[in-house]
Amino acid sequence: MQIVRRAVVGVYGVLAFVLGGMVSWIGVRMGIGMWVGALIAFGVFAWGMWPSWRRWRVARQPFPTAWRLWLEAHVPFYRGLDAVGRRRFERDVQFFLDEQRFEGVGVEVTETLRLAVAAGAALLLHGRPNWELPARRTFLFYAGRFNEDYDEDALGDYEGMAHAQGPVILSAKAVEMGWAVPHDGDNVVLHELAHLFDFENLDADGIPTLLNPASAEAWRRLMRAEMVKVRQGRSVLRRYAATSAAEFFAVAVENFFERPELLAHRHPELFEALCAFFNLDPRSSGQTQG
């Protein structure tokens, strides 16, 4: 995540120039001068750069010690980063917390719950500083499991659910457990955030939008082969990964970050594909692929 994105500067710079130039030309023709056009150009550019200015302000804020201690205790990847990597990870956490909405249904939205989700986003984006989490979201917390009607149900099928449009729903209990046991390949935050990369295609198909189009067919073939292994019980991924391509991608992401050594040993081709996609090797924090 970046404070200033070059693409945004370029788009709003051109837009400000064109609109300002047109209004200035009209102003000169009408005898009122160019000042209105200049004012409009400034307003358009300032409006476009507002999110960058806000991020700049957020980045200048100190990172709370309590947050840092939580990351050290629950996110092994963060512990392995050098000082520069840690600061970037922390900054991404701050950006995420400032820009996303968090609400609770019968449960208090604690600082820990918010931080737990932000840590997942910072982890997924760490190897790609120029990436952003697709779309701003509301993260809705339930106390425990829920059913397909979004009612709390101790026997419900869901601990998390992401929508192409709409909130990401998470069980508060599952969020806490996901980080309490960081090496079991079961983390609802990473799972649901992974779905957001997939939803940009409109139809969740297990092929994330940010994947290089030239690699899409190879990834599709790899997914099919790995899903067969899951169905046959020859995979480190839990059986839920075989229910659909979208769920395969999400479960694979969980294991990539939580059990990288095991995934690399048992499924080297899958591991290398995810290393290329996320541009990092989670076995060695901070080591990007290029």
Residue ranges and their predicted role:
Residues W50-E159, H163, L270-S284:
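A metal-dependent hydrolase signature that marks the N-terminal structural subdomain at the beginning
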Residues D82, H183-N201, A250:
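Active-site recognition of the HExxH zinc-binding catalytic motif
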Residues M1-Q2:
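Short, Lys/Arg-rich, polar N-terminal cytosolic tail immediately upstream
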Residues W25-A41:
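Hydrophobic alpha-helical transmembrane segments
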Residues G10-V11, G20-I26, F42-R55:
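Alpha-helical transmembrane segments
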Residues R5-G13, W50, A119-R128, G144-A180, ...:
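Metalloprotease/metallohydrolase-associated module, dominated by Zn2+-dependent proteases
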Residues L113, V181-D186, A246:
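Hydrophobic (often cysteine-bearing) scaffold residues that line and stabilize catalytic clefts
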Residues R5-M22, D82:
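Alpha-helical bilayer-embedded segments of polytopic membrane proteins, i.e.
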